[in-house]
Amino acid sequence: MSRPKEMTRAVIVGHKSILEETIDALHDINLFHIEDFVEDESGFKISKPFKNGEEVSKKLVKIRSIANYLGIESKKPVVQKSDAVLRELDTKLNELDRTISAKTETISQLENELKDLDAQKREILPYLSINLDFEYYRGYESLKVFAGTVKGSLEESQISSITKAYELYYDPQSKAVVLFVAKNDADKVYELLQGLGFKELRVPERGGVPSELLRFIEQKEAEVTRRIESLKGEIESLKVKYADFILASDEVLSIESQKAELPLRIATSANAFIIDGWTATEDFDKIVSVVNSATNGKAYVTSLELHHEEEEHAPVKYNNSKVVAPMQEIMDLYSRPKYTELDPSSAIFITFPLIYGMILGDIGYAIILGSLALAIKKLVKSDAVKPLMNILIYCQIWTIIFGVLYGEFLGFSLASSHTAHGMAAGLIPGWETITLFESIGGEEFTFPIHRSHMVMTMIAISVLVGLIHLNLGFLFGFSNIARHHGIKHAVLEKGSWIIIELGVLVAVLGYFGGIQVFTYAGALILVIGVVMLTMGEGIKGPIELPSLMGNALSYARIIAVGLSSIYIAGTVNDIAFEMIWPDHSQIGAAAIAAIIVFILGHGLNTILSIIAPGLHALRLQYVEFFGKFYEGGGRKFNPFGYIRKYTEE
């Protein structure tokens, strides 16, 4: 167990003439967490950004807009000198902006042209079956032209009964109709067409035969599409060419922006500045040295004496080894520890994977999930993903350990065992189940441990693990309280719970062992523990006594969730092998289907093997374990600086 790194509150004071050098020095070392200044009656006020702040912000917005448009993502860094990036920035940024703007504008025009061509095509398509030049549809003084579609069937006899002077073009399939009649007969013909559900269509204004026009439009569409694709290809080549420059420029401008805007967070007067913040105590001397070097000793750096109230609000920097560090993700998911309390990362480094492994306990699933985690860790470069994959790997190590204890591989038993129907063979020849002793309810305790045959024993073991876990929490709570309120409070508030458990244990052993002295002694210890608890926590303490049993019984989920995984795997195996050997003598025709069932079934159970054990192991940490000692609510230590990836000084 460890506590967060010891922090020192420091103040940097100096003349405004050295503010920029001070900011540069603090940013470069990336070790100083700056507290935002809140204006008060002291006479100090927040200042304005540096003169280059607005220009830097505009360039940063532009470079990020370009990066977003091009779809540029983080990649394996090509480290460049920041000075070189800044020298080329204006030229390359303007060139890139002009080029992309020109190409995107052209693409936009071409896409509008495509939409126009599509609209022209939609106008022509209804007339495609009528091979008549559109010039013939207009320009008549004595003729009326009806162009559209009808719902019913149109016969020439219907027209000829009205007038003999007509010209009809009609397609029975598309119901398209073009009808030329004398204007004197137009009203009667219109009444006829209306009765057939006539719907007038717009006649294209251009001349030409529909089929030829359609061919021309499609050729034009293909040409425009090719030009668009060509321009998009050119833009994609810009992405390849300028990706490193854009990533490096974004980094350099982000750094310059941070520096330029820092005056908005610190106290300044007409001539002086004050920067207030925190640093790890081990880094304080380095900050003094770097700031003095950057300002030629003109800045004053000092540490402040901390009061208890200030410690409560100190930012928290974890103090864990590289191996334990991934568990900080689990801590941050819940809440970062306060500066004044224990950091349980080291504890859950053991307890979380252990409980996960105890639940899953299958070598086959552990190998699959472990391999998957290693592959993702290698392929995905994200700093957010790697710790999660490390946690998954830790869990699979414990899963393999328990898989050996349980003798399980994808739901199969590795060791042969005696059953009511005779000897059940295991996957490993010669490995037989050994009976060690008789356990709870007449169950035989064996090696390997067959969980489905030792349910009561496994429940008892799970609850025992829970009690150990809970008492570890009480010990951590004891340490936290002893540090802040003294041993007496720690003994009354947390030690009393352990004494109560001891009393119950002694009384139970005395009762079942027939030793009355133990029974009475246990009862006395229990009463003493309850009195101490009442003194420490008031009436709330005894009221919470039943919760201890509830917390302990919550750990029975270890065996419950584990058994569900076993039964799913066993069911998949039974179905698959029943399909392969339907009569237990020869392989059946459904072997391929059985293999699919086997793969899909175990694939689904593999996914569940991440979710179910993970969630339940996490719940036991957050609810049962943390509930005994942990408050959380700490602030993240966020130093002023930037972790460079694509540039260097």
Swiss-Prot record:
InterPro entries: V-ATPase_116kDa_su. The keyword Lyase does not apply. Component of the A-type ATP synthase that produces ATP from ADP in the presence of a proton gradient across the membrane. This is A-type ATP synthase subunit I. Has multiple subunits, A(3), B(3), C, D, E, F, G, I and K(x); there may be a few other subunits as well. It comes from the Archaea. The keyword Ion transport applies. It is a multi-pass membrane protein. This organism has both a Na(+)-translocating F1F0 ATP synthase and this H(+)-translocating A1A0 ATP synthase. Pfam families: V_ATPase_I. It is found in: Cell membrane. NCBIfam families: PRK05771.2-4 (NF004430). Its main location: membrane. GO terms for molecular function: ATPase binding; proton-transporting ATPase activity, rotational mechanism. Keywords: Cell membrane, Hydrogen ion transport, Ion transport, Membrane, Transmembrane, Transmembrane helix, Transport. Belongs to the V-ATPase 116 kDa subunit family. One of its GO terms (biological process) is vacuolar acidification. One of its GO terms (cellular component) is plasma membrane. The chain crosses the membrane at residues 348-368, 391-411, 422-442, 458-478, 498-518, 519-539, 558-578, 592-612.
